[in-house]
C-alpha cells in the first residue's frame, strides 16, 4: 500500500503550489464548499494513479487544491463509501495520501439521519464521538509501522480544541449548532425504525454510512480531526414518512450558506 500512496501523492504534488495544512472531506450535497477554494487546481479521481472513483449522486468525484481563507487546503469533492463495494483500504486511501502530502488536520463532513428526537432536519452537529457499527475496521490486516501504532488510542478521536473552536464560531455567527455521537452503518439501505430505537438506546444522536473509517485512519496517522454532520432528515420511525436520497440533497442545499460560513471561519482561525 505504501507504494500506491506514494504514487498518488507524487502525482498530486506536481500540481501543488504548497503543502496543504488542512484536508476536507465533503459529504452528500456539501461539495459546494470546494467552489469557494481560491486558485483551484482540480484533479478528477480517475486521473490520479491508484485512486478509486466515486459513484454517488451529489459527489463530484474530484480533488480540489488551493487556498481557503488564506490557508492551503486539499478537498475531496465526493468520498468513497463501503456500500459501493470498495474495500476499507480504498475507502480510506485518500486520507493516507493527504497525510503523505503534509496535511495536519482533517475536517470531515457528512449528511446524517437524526436519531436524537430533539434534532431537526437542517441542524448542523459537531461530532463529539462515534460508534463504529459497520462490522469492520480499516486497520484490520498487517500494520505498517510508518503509518501509525498497531493499537491506536481512540479516546479523543475528535480533536477537542477544534470542536470547541467550531462551537464558538457557530455561536459568534448565530448558526444553530448541536453536538453529539455519530454512528456509522454500512448501508446502502436506510435503518429500520427498530434499529434507530436501538441506536438511540446506545447513546447515538445521528446515523450515517461514512466518516468513521476515515476518522479511524486519520487518528492512526496522527492527524487532528473535526467532524460535522448535517442532519438531513429524521431517522426512520421518528416521522411517518419514507426516507430518500432526494430529501437528503434538498436539505443540504438549504443549509449550505450556514455550513459554508462555519467551515470557512474554522479554516481561517485554524492554528
From Swiss-Prot:
InterPro entries: Nucleoside_phosphorylase_d (IPR000845), Nucleoside_phosphorylase_sf (IPR035994), Pur_Nuc_Pase_Ino/Guo-sp (IPR011270), Purine_phosphorylase (IPR011268), Purine_phosphorylase-2_CS (IPR018099). The gene is punA. This is Purine nucleoside phosphorylase 1. PANTHER family: METHYLTHIOADENOSINE/PURINE NUCLEOSIDE PHOSPHORYLASE, PURINE NUCLEOSIDE PHOSPHORYLASE-RELATED. It comes from Bacillus subtilis (strain 168). Keywords: Glycosyltransferase, Phosphoprotein, Transferase. GO terms for molecular function: purine-nucleoside phosphorylase activity. It catalyses: a purine 2'-deoxy-D-ribonucleoside + phosphate = a purine nucleobase + 2-deoxy-alpha-D-ribose 1-phosphate. A purine D-ribonucleoside binds at residues 191, 233. It is an enzyme of class 2 (transferase). The modification Phosphoserine is found at residue 28.
